[in-house]
Amino acid sequence: MPWSVDFDAATGVVQSVFVGELSPAELMAALAATIEASRNNESRRVLADCSALTTGHSLVDLYDAAVAAAADPNTLPLREAVLVPTSAEAADLVSFWETAATNRGLQVRAFTDRAEALAWLTGARP
């Protein structure tokens, strides 16, 4: 499985990690698992580590995921920090996700630095 979802009790952040190729079905499964972990742990803060993501899904898949996330009452308000992948193609997909999700009312921001992403999520200053 190219993704995992865990809850970090120390920071109160749901952490989703993506590695390699992520199919459209895996993207939607990861989204559902992230929303469930957010609900179960009463956290609206998500760190999506896409730094090792390559590709596997399309802009349409991301658009559909943004629509689904915004339509789920368990996601609002949601604050998600996304660690940008090193792959240029995957980085473009993250940029699209940031725009599509933000346009639907989610707070999404892309980062290249994990510490900065966590600081934004938790309100801490690095």
Briefly describe each language-model feature range.
Residues 1-126:
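Amphipathic, Lys/Arg-enriched alpha-helical "gate/interface" segment within cytosolic domains
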